Swiss-Prot record:
GO terms for biological process: translation. CDD domains: Ribosomal_L22. One of its GO terms (molecular function) is structural constituent of ribosome. Keywords: Chloroplast, Plastid, Ribonucleoprotein, Ribosomal protein, RNA-binding, rRNA-binding. Part of the 50S ribosomal subunit. The keyword RNA-binding applies. This is Large ribosomal subunit protein uL22c. It comes from the Eukaryota. PANTHER family: CHLOROPLAST 50S RIBOSOMAL PROTEIN L22-RELATED, LARGE RIBOSOMAL SUBUNIT PROTEIN UL22M. The keyword Ligase does not apply. This protein binds specifically to 23S rRNA.
Amino acid sequence: MQTNTSNKKIRAVAKHIHMSPHKVRRVVSQIRGRSYEQALMILEFMPYRACNPILQLLSSAAANANHNFGLSKTNLFISEIQVNKGTFFKRFQPRAQGRGYPIHKPTCHITIVLNILPK
């Protein structure tokens, strides 16, 4: 029995990444719409700290495609990738005379959707 693989979407989600969504979006905009192999090369050589979790998530999505659908990694491209704001870690920095200044440590959620390259 032949299954229709043209409409399958492969997803991977990373939540509560300890980075600002603004800084992660700077990297994500460079790989949106590219093939899996091109995105790997771009992420390998970019000097930003946000590249590492995106690289791990991209390889996880490709492994999902291979394990769940039996698809080759060379036939995949990034159809959707989005970065959403997560929760803030709230901390206080002690200041003079008993005061405390709030510190907000941002997190983000990254979602990658891969699809099969059209022939």
